[in-house]
């Protein structure tokens, strides 16, 4: 028997209320802050991610699903959402729009990762990107938007971690100092971190291995190497967050995993016991648009994993309202009533009344059992005798009462009762 591929999951009907709830609140918060939805293809030119995410990153070197199609084009299933949005921004001339251009997405993401709780090889992200504004107040607004999104969902006990990793002018000095420090401790590092020493030095700070974390504890801090412009930007961001009453913790080891980040980086974590560690994060990518062939354009974004959000909702006992389902079951008795009930079901649905119905000949007792198992409150019973009289039986399943209702009044009566 076939099963879903490793690292993927089926989203069954009982989980759909969570997904509907998260998507609904995502669209709501996006509208509040003026973001418009943009959907990009599931696959892109592989070069887009090599160029934007960075050849030395784990995503590009280990985690991308890349294939060659029959035309010889090298394509990659989308491993993150920002680069495709930036590609669409350039391709469709959005740089002529009023700045900042605010876009959001709800997308499937694909990474060949080790499956674990809240982490899948195909997962889903909600992300928003603001392109064309350099001021740190935008950074603060995006962080507030992310924070408010979680609050809307009921996840309120949160921790915000913040750092600035500088720009292309000052970051090389910091990376040089970091490399010098780590080279003195190379013997204490895991094999992956020894590789990162030359290829992706900033990621040394992010290693979760105990021996590497011990070395990272005394590593140089990016804040000590910021140029005057980056320092002023970071100071203004902290000032704006304070005005917004958003508590933050400066984490000088926070770097994020993508090469395109600059200046602001942040992560949000729920503090509830047993919660998934990081549920969302983001930062600035002021050089990415230029890197993809556009003009130098500042930008800032955020993304959050929907599976991780739902895991935290369940752990905190937050249960969304169930999705609407039919409150009426339509039963019939007899061949003539069978055809009439089929037409009646169509009329009821056109009037906005959700209906369950039976399709094959069953006894009325079996149909009522089916209605009871579906949890409906009302059953409409149509038989040969009722058809002759131009009426139907409307039965209350909770109170076991029933009444004959003329067919031309049935829709109004059902709407009145439900």
Swiss-Prot record:
Keywords: Aminoacyl-tRNA synthetase, ATP-binding, Cytoplasm, Ligase, Nucleotide-binding, Protein biosynthesis
Compartment(s) of residence: Cytoplasm
GO MF, any single term: histidine-tRNA ligase activity
GO cellular component, one term: cytoplasm
Recorded catalytic activity of this chain's protein: tRNA(His) + L-histidine + ATP = L-histidyl-tRNA(His) + AMP + diphosphate + H(+)
EC number(s) reported in the record: 6.1.1.21
Domain of life: Bacteria
GO biological process: histidyl-tRNA aminoacylation
CDD domains: HisRS-like_core, HisRS_anticodon
Ranges in a coiled coil: none
Pfam families (UniProt xref): HGTP_anticodon, tRNA-synt_His
Main location: cytoplasm
Family to which the UniProt record says this protein belongs: Belongs to the class-II aminoacyl-tRNA synthetase family.
Assembly mode: Homodimer.
PANTHER family assigned to the protein according to its UniProt record, in alphabetical order: HISTIDINE--TRNA LIGASE, MITOCHONDRIAL-RELATED, HISTIDYL-TRNA SYNTHETASE
Identification of the protein by name: Histidine--tRNA ligase
């Amino acid at each position: 028997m076939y099963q879903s591929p490793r690292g993927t999951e089926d989203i069954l009907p009982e989980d759909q209320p969570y997904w509907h709830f998260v998507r609904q609140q995502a669209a709501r918060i996006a509208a509040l802050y003026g973001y418009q939805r943009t959907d990009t293809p599931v696959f892109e030119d592989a070069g887009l991610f090599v160029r934007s995410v960075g050849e030395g990153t784990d995503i590009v070197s280990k985690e991308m699903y890349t294939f060659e199609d029959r035309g010889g084009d090298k394509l990659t299933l989308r491993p993150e959402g920002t680069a495709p949005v930036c590609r669409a921004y350039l391709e469709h001339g959005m740089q002529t729009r009023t700045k900042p251009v605010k876009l959001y997405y709800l997308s499937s993401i694909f990474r060949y990762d080790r499956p674990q709780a809240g982490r899948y090889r195909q997962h889903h992200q909600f992300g928003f990107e603001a392109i064309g504004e350099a001021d740190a107040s935008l950074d603060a607004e995006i962080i507030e938007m992310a924070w408010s999104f979680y609050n809307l969902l009921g996840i309120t006990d949160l921790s915000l971690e913040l750092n600035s990793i500088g720009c292309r002018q000052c970051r090389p000095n910091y990376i040089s100092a970091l490399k010098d420090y780590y080279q003195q401790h190379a013997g204490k590092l895991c094999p992956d971190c020894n590789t990162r020493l030359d290829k992706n030095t900033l990621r040394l700070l992010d290693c979760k291995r105990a021996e590497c974390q011990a070395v990272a504890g005394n590593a140089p801090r990016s804040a000590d190497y910021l140029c005057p412009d980056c320092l002023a930007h970071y100071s203004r961001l902290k000032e704006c967050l304070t005005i917004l009453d958003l508590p933050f913790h400066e984490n000088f080891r926070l770097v994020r995993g993508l090469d395109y980040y600059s200046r602001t980086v942040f992560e949000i974590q729920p503090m509830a016991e047993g919660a998934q560690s990081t549920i969302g994060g983001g930062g600035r990518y002021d050089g990415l648009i230029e890197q993809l062939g556009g003009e130098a354009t500042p930008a800032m974004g955020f993304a959050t994993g929907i599976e991780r959000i739902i895991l935290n909702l369940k752990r905190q006992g937050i249960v969304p309202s169930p999705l609407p389902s039919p409150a009426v079951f339509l039963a019939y008795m007899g061949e003539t009533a069978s055809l009439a009930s089929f037409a009646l079901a169509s009329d009821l649905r056109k009037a906005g009344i959700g209906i369950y119905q039976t399709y094959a000949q069953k006894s009325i007792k079996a149909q009522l059992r089916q209605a009871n198992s579906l949890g409906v409150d009302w059953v409409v019973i149509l038989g040969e005798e009722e058809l002759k009289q131009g009426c139907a039986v409307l039965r209350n399943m909770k109170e076991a009462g029933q009444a004959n209702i003329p067919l031309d009044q049935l829709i109004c009566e059902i709407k009145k009762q439900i």
